[in-house]
Design a protein with these regions (language model features):
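C-terminal structured domains
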Residues: 115-118, 156-158
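Amphipathic alpha-helical packing elements
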Residues: 3, 14-71
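Extended, charged low-complexity segments
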Residues: 139-171
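Catalytic cores and motor modules of nucleic-acid processing enzymes
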Residues: 96-97, 103-105, 134-135, 146-147, ...
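A short, well-structured beta->alpha microelement
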Residues: 124-143
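Structural motif
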Residues: 102-108, 127-133, 153-158
Length: 171
């Protein structure tokens, strides 16, 4: 025996089964026309994402990304420092999708929006200690008519990760 998994199978027909499996997997993956691929690469760049991330979100949801939710923790905005750092502001300004700030805790939403013009708007985030149903309702209010699977959350704290499930967000 070779290795922990007893080595390659010696059963008759192994290479044929491997060939069939490879062909079936290849047939499942669609071949995108080059122009569609170029368009998606450009869209990923417009969103500030690498293509692999954009493609995985698009494959998971079947939709394009139309908005980002940024928690104040991810933007390093605090009650004492309401303006985000220069590098983050430049990167955020280049994103071609709706950019919504979610100030956490005692950070006023109107002040966060006013001092960070790169954000399209800022709306108070769900309380970190709020239950799942409350967080879901709050995120639905924030998103309005935009379906959750077209929105990406950029968070920094473990409790913020639960907002993805609560709001049925793309990631």
């Amino acid at each position: 025996m070779i290795g922990h998994n007893r080595g390659p199978s010696m059963a008759p027909g192994e290479t044929w089964r491997r060939h069939c499996w490879t062909q079936a997997r290849t047939a499942l993956l669609p071949v995108l026309p080059i122009e569609v691929l170029r368009t998606r690469v450009r869209r990923a760049a417009d969103l500030g994402l690498d293509y692999r991330t954009y493609a995985s979100v698009r494959a998971q949801t079947g939709h394009d990304v139309v908005a980002f939710l940024f928690s104040s923790n991810a933007l390093r905005v605090t009650a004492l420092q309401l303006r985000m750092a220069g590098a983050a502001a430049v990167k955020l300004a280049a994103v071609r999708a709706e950019r919504i700030g979610l100030p956490v805790g005692r950070i006023p939403a109107d002040a966060m929006a006013a001092l960070n013009p790169e954000l399209d708007r800022a709306v108070a985030a769900p309380a970190l200690w709020a239950g799942f149903a409350v967080a879901r309702q709050r995120l639905r209010e924030v998103l309005g008519h935009v379906p959750g699977d077209r929105v990406i959350l950029v968070g920094d704290q473990p409790l913020e990760a639960e907002w993805c499930a609560a709001g049925r967000l793309a990631g």
